[in-house]
UniProtKB/Swiss-Prot annotation:
It comes from Rattus norvegicus (Rat). The gene is Smpd2. It comes from the Eukaryota. It is found in: Membrane. This is Sphingomyelin phosphodiesterase 2. Changing H136A: Complete loss of activity.
Amino acid sequence: MKHNFSLRLRVFNLNCWDIPYLSKHRADRMKRLGDFLNLESFDLALLEEVWSEQDFQYLKQKLSLTYPDAHYFRSGIIGSGLCVFSRHPIQEIVQHVYTLNGYPYKFYHGDWFCGKAVGLLVLHLSGLVLNAYVTHLHAEYSRQKDIYFAHRVAQAWELAQFIHHTSKKANVVLLCGDLNMHPKDLGCCLLKEWTGLRDAFVETEDFKGSEDGCTMVPKNCYVSQQDLGPFPFGVRIDYVLYKAVSGFHICCKTLKTTTGCDPHNGTPFSDHEALMATLCVKHSPPQEDPCSAHGSAERSALISALREARTELGRGIAQARWWAALFGYVMILGLSLLVLLCVLAAGEEAREVAIMLWTPSVGLVLGAGAVYLFHKQEAKSLCRAQAEIQHVLTRTTETQDLGSEPHPTHCRQQEADRAEEK
């Protein structure tokens, strides 16, 4: 690769709010989105909440000349809602479904039925290997009483691990999506500290868009004040994150958001605002010690995030075990009731009552058993994430105590990882 190598990458990201039968003005919004993407001709368009495969096929056909490669990530019952459109050939595609996706009995929230996931596409651009990830994490339905907090932390860790272990051959890593987390939330900090990804909004040289980069704003006609909760001026939960390995330099030249309306038509594309980033990748000769200046501070931030995540996952484990125990007792009670009904049915006096109560009792046992098994699985999944975090925390703390150099967010570690692959 030439030393004067330079690559400009234009990226588009949007949570499309494309829910069949529920989302307003779907057909019109999809048509205008397709027109806009054709007009702008981005290198990559990464979309979330496209829960109608028919709408994906419509966009794929409409964008086929501008974006010849496209992929729809299928998972769960409803689907992940993730899809990508690329001007460049997609070399590889991988999908990973998160282990924890909410609760099946919270059917009115729907996250469990979607099978929230992360999609990876590998592109080769002028000799450079780009790993682009698109994801959508579990929604936050209540800031004050967030029953899914542990699930979202576990998803953030799973996402960070997936990126860490699949990006070792990549020169540039790009993550776009709706993380459903504010910039300073634990999951967001954990993700950025472990992967070394940088926030385009923080790093950009030129920003134009909604105040504070918010991606849900009150002036959007599809957003209600209830959606914003205690943040009346808007929230920033959609992101463009990126990094480059040693030997390359990446920066965000411009970042734009829509501001509650379509730039050309006036009405919004979605209840979320779109993100449009222009990234510049250049060849950069490796420095002698590119990370030593900030290594200690970054390790301290990582250790802090890992400790907090371990604590929150511990709370989630305790809660899951409590629910499993409760429904285990209910299941035992139901089985005891069935035994009693069998005894009563053997006699003449209470046979009709026993027969009448038999079906509800069987339903109680089956329902309680299903919920018991789900929470047992939830507890084990949270324990697995906590054990992984504890292992990384132990290793990182030992490294800090020995005064050794960087954790995986630093470039020298990534060089070592890449060397091992060769």
